Curated annotation (Swiss-Prot):
Annotated compartments: Cytoplasm
Main localisation: cytoplasm
Keywords associated with the record: Cytoplasm, Schiff base, Thiamine biosynthesis, Transferase
Organism of origin: Neorickettsia sennetsu (strain ATCC VR-367 / Miyayama)
Binding annotation for 1-deoxy-D-xylulose 5-phosphate: G160, A186, G187, N208, T209
Taxonomy of the source species: Bacteria, Pseudomonadati, Pseudomonadota, Alphaproteobacteria, Rickettsiales
Broad class of enzyme this protein falls into: transferase
Residues annotated as catalytic: K99
Originating gene: thiG
GO cellular component, one term: cytoplasm
The protein's name: Thiazole synthase
Length: 256
């Protein structure tokens, strides 16, 4: 059965998106990403080195023809900053599918939703396909979609915390109301967290720190790949209805 993740008319067979930061070196980055099976990788614009061809860059290790680069605006604190960064990325790198991150403060890195919404409106109006990092607030998620977002990326917990999904109910509401893909972003710490997100009906999961900072990143990347697949299959299969009584696996007929 074909079950592709579709974002802005692009089809991907993997529902796992991975980040490229926090690894020990580029070699480890490549090995982990290959093990994850991901086709989309998020990159901070400073890591793709779009202005200095002499300096070592991620593109030297991860072929942009093989992977879809999803440039993000990490550590932007205003809509204007984010828009300027992505305009430069499109001009030099040709990237049109982008991830918008506009932080409100530096300790917990929660998104500034007012500035995020502003950035989405501007970028969508300029022809970008925008995937915004956002709070798990159903109302704001709907407004982002109505403003032109091609996918919604609510956090599970603060970026890099590994705390897992803190508000599963809100995620389910966001999934139910959305007509664009919902991709859980930030806070996924374990493969079981990824399974929970996918079983809840989310369309994908973005993971970076829990792979990069695992004791064995390549093994964790493989685990996350299988977790996302298992959760998706479980969601499509449809879980049994829970009940408040026991039900034996075999009946008692024919027992002497």
């Amino acid at each position: 059965m074909l079950d592709h993740l579709e974002i802005a008319g692009r089809n991907f067979s993997s529902r796992l998106i991975v980040g490229t930061g926090k690894y020990k070196n580029f070699d480890e980055t490549v090995k982990a990403i290959e093990a994850s099976g991901a086709e989309v990788v998020t990159v901070a614009l400073k890591r793709v080195n779009i202005t200095d061809n002499k300096r070592e860059s991620l593109q030297d290790y991860l072929d942009p023809k093989k992977y879809t680069y999803l440039p993000n605006t990490a550590f932007c604190f205003t809509a204007g900053e984010a828009v300027r960064h992505l305009a430069l990325a499109r001009e030099i790198g040709g990237w049109n599918l982008v991830k918008v991150e506009v932080f409100s403060e530096k300790e917990f890195l929660y998104p500034d939703m007012r500035e995020t919404l502003k950035a989405v409106k501007i970028l969508a109006g300029e022809g970008f396909h925008v995937m915004p990092y956002c709070n798990d607030d159903p109302i704001m998620c709907k407004r982002l979609e109505e403003s032109g977002a091609v996918a919604i990326m609510p956090l599970a917990a603060p970026i890099g915390s590994g705390l897992g999904i803190q508000n599963l109910f809100n995620l389910k509401v966001i999934v139910k109301q959305s007509s664009v893909p919902v991709i859980v972003d930030a806070g996924v710490g374990t493969p079981s967290d990824a399974v929970i997100a996918m079983e809840a009906g989310c369309d994908g999961v973005l993971i970076n720190t829990s792979i990069a900072k695992a004791r064995f990143p390549v093994q964790m990347a493989k685990a996350m790949k299988h977790a996302v697949r298992a959760g998706r299959l479980g969601y499509l299969a449809g879980r049994m209805l829970p009940q408040q009584f026991a039900s034996p696996s075999s009946n008692s007929s024919g027992i002497v």
